[in-house]
Amino acid sequence: MTFDEAGDLLDRMAEKFPEEFYADLNGGISLLPDEMPDPEFPPGEMYILGEYCDDQMGKYILLYYGSFAALAAKEEWTEADWEEELYATLAHEFTHHIEGLAGERGLDLKDEAFLESWHEELDP
């Protein structure tokens, strides 16, 4: 899937989320061409697919096309796989946003536990 095709798909997906999810998301959702390997893992093992950001620029969601493309090539994704991964990542980042508005950290803690288990698996 090309960058433009992924962007079009992401636009269609974003329109399906409830309006309430966009409360205070003043920076919106951006698809960037970057590949973001996670520096805490061996090369090619883990990629950052998306991020929820809350900083001086505002609140916004970034998705990294290059990371999706790297995994798609490695795992031989179909178009359905692209759709599933983009949707799951967007929903995940929206959850971070909504939890952040509520002062909750449940998904942050779950993410930390997931990454810790990967580290343990790689370095038994």
Q: What are these language model-derived features?
A:
Residues 3-10, 83, 87:
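Generic alpha-helical secondary structure
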Residues 9-26:
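Zn2+-dependent metallopeptidase catalytic core
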Residues 93:
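Walker B catalytic acidic pair
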Residues 2-5, 22-40:
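Propeptide-to-catalytic entry region of secreted or membrane-anchored zinc metalloproteases
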Residues 90:
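PRPP/pyrophosphate-binding module of the type I phosphoribosyltransferase fold
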